[in-house]
UniProtKB/Swiss-Prot annotation:
SUPFAM superfamilies found in the cross-reference section: ALDH-like (SSF53720)
Gene that encodes it: luxC
Pathway it works in: Lipid metabolism; fatty acid reduction for biolumincescence
This protein's name: Long-chain acyl-protein thioester reductase 2
Domain of life: Bacteria
Originating species: Photobacterium leiognathi
This enzyme's EC code(s): 1.2.1.50
Amino acid sequence: MIKKIPMIIGGVVQNTSGYGMRELTLNNNKVNIPIITQSDVEAIQSLNIENKLTINQIVNFLYTVGQKWKSETYSRRLTYIRDLIKFLGYSQEMAKLEANWISMILCSKSALYDIVENDLSSRHIIDEWIPQGECYVKALPKGKSVHLLAGNVPLSGVTSILRAILTKNECIIKTSSADPFTATALVNSFIDVDAEHPITRSISVMYWSHSEDLAIPKQIMSCADVVIAWGGDDAIKWATEHAPSHADILKFGPKKSISIVDNPTDIKAAAIGVAHDICFYDQQACFSTQDIYYIGDSIDIFFDELAQQLNKYKDILPKGERNFDEKAAFSLTERECLFAKYKVQKGESQSWLLTQSPAGSFGNQPLSRSAYIHQVNDISEVIPFVHKAVTQTVAIAPWESSFKYRDILAEHGAERIIEAGMNNIFRVGGAHDGMRPLQRLVNYISHERPSTYTTKDVSVKIEQTRYLEEDKFLVFVP
């Protein structure tokens, strides 16, 4: 039986029994997704849900949803895990971890408050006018936010949606053909908790293809007040071409990440961290380590220890299924590296691949837990491989070394500096791809104080007409 993915408009699962269907093949299994009609577009464009919720009400709703995801018997969670395994090729452990993280994000009330506090300067600014300088300021939602999701990291879609919810924006979510499940499961869980809740009613989920008739997608894009685009170069280019001229575009495009191991005294701890950063999401994420730069003389010991830790991850977080082409690319990379006389070691059943090669001698990168290790003398030999708009995360072991290198790494384009083993946890207060996303999802409105309000520099009321009449402007210049 072919699985059918629902279309959701305004928090309501649509009856698409008479619709045309688009068939996707995922992990050798068929999925049907309804094709959007003109009436669907009109329903999306006319949707206008009044959202007078406070930040407390928003966070409490998300927490309630998160408690459902926390339950291992929640039917929506169980179905989601099965879908990730069957259609996306996730291992049981990977799929369960993804569901666990959804629960963690939704249930972390303090973190949700702090995200707003850190990005917008105050968690109250979306609810009320806040005194700032000589004004009162309030942050209002942009309006309709269109989310063009990627399929490589399901949690990126969850994050995108939650940012829009926290800033009271409506969400029009275009799922990826590689993962039509995550956003749909999340919004269905909103419906399970409260189908009439303003957050539920302000969200729509659907799919369209960039390579087919664009008449319908263009109409949807035309109503966007802000576009959040995730994915590769083609996806970002498509978003840029089709977003309205007035709409802001948040671009989360393709990035690469590296690890620096700085002559650690605890080689095992460093290897554990690097192994995690290689294995999480099987290197499909922008934050996944692909290259390791080892500063010091104990690279052989580190190489062997890293191999052991990769074997451990083979057991505690098995990699997902791969198709024939992916396996062939893995084998080809191994043979090319052996032919180049590099030191090569691989795990059982292609569970991982480790290659020691000179810095700059990059071969193919099949991902799927394959990494290159390069021995260098100091940080100056790493910097040529750190690039603006390309290098996202630099993971460092030991953590203390990050203080030595953070300035030069930042100057050359690194966007995020972390402790090895923490690549998938974006700390509250940090930037994402060089920006604070929530600031781009709101409009700041200023209510400025009157002429009678004195400033720090001018202790009398501002009487501009009098200053002109008496030609006394310069008297008040500090």
